[in-house]
From Swiss-Prot:
GO (cellular component) term, any one: phosphopyruvate hydratase complex
Annotated catalytic residues: 211 (proton donor), 345 (proton acceptor)
Residues the record lists as binding Mg(2+): 246, 295, 320
Name of the featured protein: Enolase
Family: Belongs to the enolase family.
Subunit structure, as described in the record: Homodimer.
Keywords: Cytoplasm, Glycolysis, Lyase, Magnesium, Metal-binding
Length: 436
């Protein structure tokens, strides 16, 4: 069937900032999608349209984007009479309607809300679960793969008020036998970590950050890794749970060097690290700790250091700000051999079709693909269906804490239950899940 109405409204994300929610109506019902928003955003991302009216919502209103959906998109999309099952036709139509390279006219936040809501309508039209529809759109093979969750349990960088330069310290239960067991392991380590931090740094160090992780006031990144390993050991899961990091290095890149004390306005330039120094530091961490994945190790345009590190890294090297889920940036990264995995964030590119293409291009290049939330989230669970539909085998959507994070993990538990024996858990093969 076709779309009879497209309606958007302004809602609030998990940080209390306005964001866009879209509802698409067909004769099968009303289908809703909420759009997330990032804090550390790559300069190459599609444009999130904000009103910029300082006196309203501190400039963060999205009434322009909402208005674009309710007028231009609603009128044109209904008139176009496209089938909701044909996701590519709908997304191409939206891209042409916008007409800009980075979706700045209508706003990537407006377009993505429509794209995801249409995809949910398409699944209902076919009478299949959302993840099955996505698998069809991507041409995914069977069996379905349930992802290894990467729980961001210690927060630093732009997400936290501590001195830590690196943004995320994650645990990945690769040794679990199923997704539900991975949830059990992750939550137990999370609670153990809370105790460890409380004993060492006091009660207020266990306040949680934007993604549900803890932000103890530590300065040395290695201390973050120590805390993880201690908690894993105390919980009894050494060997079963690995460690991952998101350094978000673009945030501490200054004049060609890296400042690990970037939150201090008077940091000492003589302590800034070169790309080689930073590479050595990462390799020293990888030698001491069970690190399986490092994301955004260098600045988003520091291709040289990316490629140099990727040439010798035996762990997963994930591009996020580097690649911004953009097929053109991904092609450049493949050509330059800059990394070996993609972080997939639907709102960096703005349509489901382009997101699927980004995943397929990356998988074709032999890369891993990790599906990701943003730090400003909603209760929308689309990425749970996307990670299963695309068989990427890994997802990061925060700590096992805060309902906007658990919404995704809980949806994956439901999908696991529904699939039963028809699905496998990626486990230790998370980097090559698409080959399973």
């Amino acid at each position: 069937s076709t779309i009879t109405k497209v309606h958007a409204r302004q809602i609030f994300d998990s940080r209390g900032n306005p964001t866009v929610e879209v509802e698409v109506t067909t004769d099968k019902g009303v289908f809703r999608a909420g759009v997330p928003s990032g804090a550390s955003t790559g300069v190459h991302e599609a444009l999130e349209l904000r009103d910029g009216v300082k006196s309203d919502y501190l400039g963060k209103g999205v009434l322009k984007a909402v208005g674009n959906v309710n007028t231009i998109i609603n009128e044109e999309l209904v008139k176009a009479n496209l089938s909701v099952v044909d996701q590519k036709a709908v997304d191409d139509f939206l891209i042409q309607l916008d007409g800009t390279e980075n979706k700045e006219k209508l706003g990537a936040n407006a377009i993505l809300g429509v794209s995801l809501a249409v995809a949910k309508a398409g699944a209902a039209e076919k009478g299949v679960p959302f993840y099955v529809h996505i698998a069809d759109l991507a041409g995914s093979k069977k069996p379905f793969v349930l992802p290894v969750p990467a729980f961001n349990v210690i927060n630093g960088g732009s997400h936290a008020g501590n001195k830590l330069a690196m943004q995320e310290f994650m645990i990945m239960p690769t040794g679990a036998k199923s997704f539900s067991e991975a949830m059990k392991l992750g939550s137990e380590v999370y609670h153990t970590l809370k105790k460890v931090i409380n004993e060492k740094y006091g009660q207020d160090a266990t306040n949680v950050g934007d993604e549900g992780g803890f932000a103890p006031n530590i300065q040395d990144n290695q201390e973050g890794l120590e805390l993880l390993v201690t908690a894993i050991e105390k919980a009894g899961y050494t060997g079963k749970i690995k460690v991952a990091m998101d350094c978000a290095a673009s945030d501490f890149y200054k004049d060609g060097k890296y400042d690990l004390d970037f939150k201090n306005p008077n940091s000492d330039p003589s302590t800034y690290l070169t790309g080689q120094d930073l590479t050595d530091l990462y390799n020293s961490y990888a030698g001491k700790y069970p690190i399986v994945s490092i994301e955004d190790a260098f600045d988003q345009d520091d291709w040289e250091n990316w490629a140099h590190m990727n040439a010798s890294a035996d762990y997963q090297l994930v591009g996020d700000d580097l690649t911004v889920t953009n097929p053109k940036r991904i092609a450049t990264a493949v050509e330059k051999k800059a990394c070996n995995a993609l972080l997939l964030k639907v709102n960096q590119i703005g349509t489901l079709t382009e997101s699927i293409q980004a995943a397929l291009d990356s998988q074709k290049a032999g890369w891993g693909v990790m599906v990701s939330h943003r730090s400003g989230e909603t209760e929308d669970t689309s990425i749970a269906s996307i990670v299963v539909g695309l068989r990427t085998g890994q997802i990061k959507t925060g700590a096992p804490c805060r309902s906007e994070r658990l919404a995704k993990y809980n949806e994956l538990l439901r999908i696991e239950e529904e699939l039963g024996d028809a699905a496998i858990y990626a486990g230790e093969h998370f980097r090559k899940a698409h080959d399973l």
